[in-house]
Amino acid sequence: MNVVKNIADLRAAVARARGEGKRIGFVPTMGNLHAGHIALVKKAGQRADFVVASIFVNPLQFGPNEDLDNYPRTLAADQEKLFDAGCHLLFAPSVEEMYPHGQANQTIVRVPGVSEGLCGGSRPGHFDGVSTVVSKLFNMVLPDLAVFGQKDFQQLAVIRTMVRDLNMPVQILSEPTVRADDGLALSSRNGYLSADERATAPVLYRTLNQLRDALQGGRRDLPALIDEGLEALRNAGLRPDYLDIRNAIDLQPVTDASSELVILAAAYLGKTRLIDNLLVDLRTSA
């Protein structure tokens, strides 16, 4: 696996692979890799001949009181994991390489509608930072396909919409959320949890499962269901940021015609913000 830190070397390496007739797969990350990231890399390897990963802790997607400075940076360990997963090229740029004219002067890519509300409501500007950095990375790598995890469901929807609206020639693939044995969605931020908090954290997933069971059992009183879910989270010691049920296709409010739903939640446990979601197919309901 080659490691490059500047755009010129990245483009040269990708051009060589493309010149050999190889299909390019891409997995953008912020590092501190876990099994969820590795599943994305392996999926890219199944669908492409040459896998590029990036590690870049993107300051544009962090708010002023968020964990940019404390976000784990584990490049050496990440390189080993990527190599073992079959990655061919790692792009690990500096902030200066990505934003040479300064962050304040960076052109911003904003995806209206789907980026608003949910995490976008709680983290103003977050998805502007995500869509901006991903569009830059797509322009640098020029991949045939890119793989994103379903754990960040709203992010996946934002990227799909951006690619559609800007006519980007890249196929977006998704990979199901990878979970610990007790159901907790794997996340780089899980390392912030204390032992007691880690023991409590799976209640988020259990609550989403209870709501999914209710929906598949025929309940359609969404406001009451959401209130029950919020109460369950609070009773377990979590501080809900949001809990909502949306149309899974476009994240719009549920209508009578909706058959594919997604339950989305974010909640604080101590100082750690956890997010999760579950898809619900009403066509398979009891």
UniProtKB/Swiss-Prot annotation:
Q: Which residues are involved in binding beta-alanine?
A: Q61
Keyword list (alphabetical) reads:
ATP-binding, Cytoplasm, Ligase, Nucleotide-binding, Pantothenate biosynthesis
Q: Does the keyword ATP-binding apply?
A: yes
Q: Any idea of its EC number? A: 6.3.2.1
List the active site: H37 (proton donor)
Task: Spell out the molecular function terms from Gene Ontology.
Answer: ATP binding; pantoate-beta-alanine ligase activity
Catalyzed reactions per annotation: (R)-pantoate + beta-alanine + ATP = (R)-pantothenate + AMP + diphosphate + H(+)
List GO terms (cellular component aspect): cytosol
Q: One matching Pfam family, short form?
A: Pantoate_ligase
Disulphide bonds annotated for this chain are none
Q: Which family does it belong to?
A: Belongs to the pantothenate synthetase family.
What else is on record for this protein? The reaction proceeds by a bi uni uni bi ping pong mechanism.
Q: Which PANTHER family match?
A: CYTIDYLATE KINASE/PANTOATE-BETA-ALANINE LIGASE, PANTOATE--BETA-ALANINE LIGASE
Stated name of the protein = Pantothenate synthetase
- Organism, per UniProt? Stutzerimonas stutzeri (strain A1501)
Q: What is the lineage of its organism?
A: Bacteria, Pseudomonadati, Pseudomonadota, Gammaproteobacteria, Pseudomonadales
- Provide the gene name from the record: panC
